[in-house]
Amino acid sequence: MSRKESRSQAFQALFQLEMENTDLSIDEAINFIKDDYPDLEFDFIYWLVSGVKDHEPVLDEKIQNNLKDWKISRLLKTDRIILRMAAFELANSDTPPKVIINEAVELAKQYSDDDHYRFINGVLSNLN
């Protein structure tokens, strides 16, 4: 399956890990995906999910520095996760920034509120 679908599933795993009162581990969150999508790039998904969780405070600070008149804690959970994923990938992969930002915008169109993809695009363009 495509890297795009792998990013979507990584988003869903991170969303599950963000739920309050959950004791899920990263491995458990990813294992839920394996049953339904055995052809995904699980090395990439694990790298992305664990990287975001391991570096969350640093990613949040980097994102916060690029928010105008907003606090990261006030963002929708979906937007925070998408921004963290893209910020981590921008800093730690060889994938062209344009591709990473475009994929984040597509995730926002799929999972966030109507026009939030524009906000995601603006923040990530400033990070890059």
Swiss-Prot record:
Gene coding for it: nusB
Species lineage: Bacteria, Bacillati, Bacillota, Bacilli, Bacillales
GO process terms (BP): DNA-templated transcription termination; transcription antitermination
Organism expressing this protein natively: Staphylococcus carnosus (strain TM300)
A GO cellular component annotation in the UniProt record: cytosol
Family per record: Belongs to the NusB family.
InterPro entries: NusB-like_sf, NusB_fam, NusB_RsmB_TIM44
Any GO MF annotation of the entry: RNA binding
Domain of life: Bacteria
Protein name listed in UniProt: Transcription antitermination protein NusB
Signal peptide from the UniProt entry: none
PANTHER family: ANTITERMINATION NUSB DOMAIN-CONTAINING PROTEIN, N UTILIZATION SUBSTANCE PROTEIN B-RELATED
